[in-house]
Amino acid sequence: MDHEAAQLEKQHVHNVYESTAPYFSDLQSKAWPRVRQFLQEQKPGSLIADIGCGTGKYLKVNSQVHTVGCDYCGPLVEIARNRGCEAMVCDNLNLPFRDEGFDAIISIGVIHHFSTKQRRIRAIKEMARVLVPGGQLMIYVWAMEQKNRHFEKQDVLVPWNRALCSQLFSESSQSGRKRQCGYPERGHPYHPPCSECSCSVCFKEQCGSKRSHSVGYEPAMARTCFANISKEGEEEYGFYSTLGKSFRSWFFSRSLDESTLRKQIERVRPLKNTEVWASSTVTVQPSRHSSLDFDHQEPFSTKGQSLDEEVFVESSSGKHLEWLRAPGTLKHLNGDHQGEMRRNGGGNFLDSTNTGVNCVDAGNIEDDNPSASKILRRISAVDSTDFNPDDTMSVEDPQTDVLDSTAFMRYYHVFREGELCSLLKENVSELRILSSGNDHGNWCIIAEKKRGCD
């Protein structure tokens, strides 16, 4: 069992971060406030370890302490070193440090990547081993309980969100200025802004939908293409603006739950007849329901489905909003450009807001292309999920050949309320919990190593 767990983590954690590490080299993200506060409260001269330091975001928060970082991912450690941080490659299950060597330890977003309970316990015990008696340990893990999202299972696969990475890079490089669209140059992961449209971060390259699938099947991501939809008067523009807000929330980190989607539907309904809208340039919409298969040849039936499950409802004419499937939607999201993309349409589908969704054009969809004529009618909101930025599906639910086998899918074990505290109380007796709580979709605990423990 341990071997299988290690293989899963290698494929869906280590390999993914190693492959995507280059995209973080120029990314300067801010330290989370509570983690920053914890580090700044440590006594001057303290020796602190950041286990799973990544690019070293927290290694220079407090200049009065000495912070050492370590991470399993070599490329991320190299980025941290290039930034002047002290970091090394190591395994959380076998830390290369002597017993009771650190005054404080932080573990931010690491424990949820271990795929079994025993491996999670071992990782925490290792950190407790190298912590001095009276020293404090801070742990952050993803929470299953979310305000606007839900998970049906705790073990999920999540696609790497390149859109988020692009947005954060844009924010860090253009702080204080209005962010505008950029167009990529071949072979470069980051791109300068342009002024042709008002979308926050819009790259003319293909990007993956935020969707995940069963561990027992090959991982993949459906590629999403956005087409510019022309404006036809203020009424139509209002429709697109409202609809665009739904899409931005739906595609990016803030997934809409069912009740929120119903509110969006009510706002959109009086603005535009869906029959006219469907005759305009059509965009690709990825499925949010585990039963949808992009390879079906016929439109999906909506018989027996209540309107509560629909993102888009029937108009007075009884016709559903229809979506065309763009060719090549199941390609690999690896940063490579698959041919020359060209702009299409007059208006901007996404108006200016802080979204960070990578936008690409569907200009190469031709009317006589058989694969482009496949229609997907129903978009379910039932499986709306929440995390940092991605939609997920249970690793136990098998998928058909909807997804590409080479996409970057990360494994996460999302923690139920109280699960992390119970894990420590029942299995790591040398630690006592000082505080616990929820911080932006993460469970956070601060524990102290008991004095007199071996």
Swiss-Prot record:
<feature type="modified residue" description="Phosphoserine">
    <location>
        <position position="214"/>
    </location>
</feature>
<keyword id="KW-0489">Methyltransferase</keyword>
<keyword id="KW-0597">Phosphoprotein</keyword>
<protein>
    <recommendedName>
        <fullName>Probable tRNA methyltransferase 9B</fullName>
        <ecNumber>2.1.1.-</ecNumber>
    </recommendedName>
</protein>
<comment type="similarity">
    <text>Belongs to the methyltransferase superfamily.</text>
</comment>
<dbReference type="GO" id="GO:0000049">
    <property type="term" value="F:tRNA binding"/>
</dbReference>
<dbReference type="InterPro" id="IPR013216">
    <property type="entry name" value="Methyltransf_11"/>
</dbReference>
<keyword id="KW-0949">S-adenosyl-L-methionine</keyword>
<keyword id="KW-0819">tRNA processing</keyword>
<dbReference type="GO" id="GO:0005634">
    <property type="term" value="C:nucleus"/>
</dbReference>
<dbReference type="GO" id="GO:0008757">
    <property type="term" value="F:S-adenosylmethionine-dependent methyltransferase activity"/>
</dbReference>
<keyword id="KW-0808">Transferase</keyword>
<dbReference type="InterPro" id="IPR029063">
    <property type="entry name" value="SAM-dependent_MTases_sf"/>
</dbReference>
<dbReference type="GO" id="GO:0002098">
    <property type="term" value="P:tRNA wobble uridine modification"/>
</dbReference>
<dbReference type="GO" id="GO:0005737">
    <property type="term" value="C:cytoplasm"/>
</dbReference>
<dbReference type="GO" id="GO:0030488">
    <property type="term" value="P:tRNA methylation"/>
</dbReference>
<dbReference type="GO" id="GO:0008175">
    <property type="term" value="F:tRNA methyltransferase activity"/>
</dbReference>
<dbReference type="InterPro" id="IPR051422">
    <property type="entry name" value="AlkB_tRNA_MeTrf/Diox"/>
</dbReference>
<dbReference type="GO" id="GO:0006400">
    <property type="term" value="P:tRNA modification"/>
</dbReference>
<comment type="function">
    <text>May modify wobble uridines in specific arginine and glutamic acid tRNAs. Acts as a tumor suppressor by promoting the expression of LIN9.</text>
</comment>
<dbReference type="GO" id="GO:0106335">
    <property type="term" value="F:tRNA (5-carboxymethyluridine(34)-5-O)-methyltransferase activity"/>
</dbReference>
<dbReference type="Pfam" id="PF08241">
    <property type="entry name" value="Methyltransf_11"/>
</dbReference>
